[in-house]
């Protein structure tokens, strides 16, 4: 799905942090430490970033029939 632009609960802007978060976690850093360093301290915001799953590449494989 589309990267969350804002936290679903509190509305804090998060879209600008997702690329940095993903890059650092894939490089092997601990997700909690990355979120702390990015200033994401609320549980709701942390959940929004950590639970996001990118499905768009998987969905583009399927053909829509009309």
From Swiss-Prot:
<feature type="binding site">
    <location>
        <position position="10"/>
    </location>
    <ligand>
        <name>Zn(2+)</name>
    </ligand>
</feature>
<keyword id="KW-0963">Cytoplasm</keyword>
<keyword id="KW-0548">Nucleotidyltransferase</keyword>
<dbReference type="GO" id="GO:0003677">
    <property type="term" value="F:DNA binding"/>
</dbReference>
<feature type="binding site">
    <location>
        <position position="45"/>
    </location>
    <ligand>
        <name>Zn(2+)</name>
    </ligand>
</feature>
<comment type="subunit">
    <text>Part of the RNA polymerase complex.</text>
</comment>
<dbReference type="Pfam" id="PF01194">
    <property type="entry name" value="RNA_pol_N"/>
</dbReference>
<keyword id="KW-0240">DNA-directed RNA polymerase</keyword>
<dbReference type="GO" id="GO:0005737">
    <property type="term" value="C:cytoplasm"/>
</dbReference>
<dbReference type="GO" id="GO:0003899">
    <property type="term" value="F:DNA-directed RNA polymerase activity"/>
</dbReference>
<dbReference type="GO" id="GO:0008270">
    <property type="term" value="F:zinc ion binding"/>
</dbReference>
<keyword id="KW-0804">Transcription</keyword>
<dbReference type="InterPro" id="IPR000268">
    <property type="entry name" value="RPABC5/Rpb10"/>
</dbReference>
<keyword id="KW-0479">Metal-binding</keyword>
<feature type="binding site">
    <location>
        <position position="7"/>
    </location>
    <ligand>
        <name>Zn(2+)</name>
    </ligand>
</feature>
<dbReference type="InterPro" id="IPR023580">
    <property type="entry name" value="RNA_pol_su_RPB10"/>
</dbReference>
<dbReference type="InterPro" id="IPR020789">
    <property type="entry name" value="RNA_pol_suN_Zn-BS"/>
</dbReference>
<comment type="function">
    <text>DNA-dependent RNA polymerase (RNAP) catalyzes the transcription of DNA into RNA using the four ribonucleoside triphosphates as substrates.</text>
</comment>
<dbReference type="GO" id="GO:0000428">
    <property type="term" value="C:DNA-directed RNA polymerase complex"/>
</dbReference>
<keyword id="KW-0808">Transferase</keyword>
<keyword id="KW-0862">Zinc</keyword>
<comment type="similarity">
    <text>Belongs to the archaeal Rpo10/eukaryotic RPB10 RNA polymerase subunit family.</text>
</comment>
<feature type="binding site">
    <location>
        <position position="44"/>
    </location>
    <ligand>
        <name>Zn(2+)</name>
    </ligand>
</feature>
<dbReference type="GO" id="GO:0006351">
    <property type="term" value="P:DNA-templated transcription"/>
</dbReference>
<protein>
    <recommendedName>
        <fullName>DNA-directed RNA polymerase subunit Rpo10</fullName>
        <ecNumber>2.7.7.6</ecNumber>
    </recommendedName>
</protein>
């Amino acid at each position: 799905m589309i990267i969350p632009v804002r936290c679903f609960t509190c509305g804090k802007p998060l879209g600008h942090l997702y690329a940095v978060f993903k890059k650092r976690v894939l490089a092997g850093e601990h997700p909690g430490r990355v979120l702390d360093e990015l200033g994401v301290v609320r549980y709701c915001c942390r959940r929004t970033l950590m639970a996001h799953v990118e499905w768009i590449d998987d969905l583009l494989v399927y053909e829509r029939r009309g």
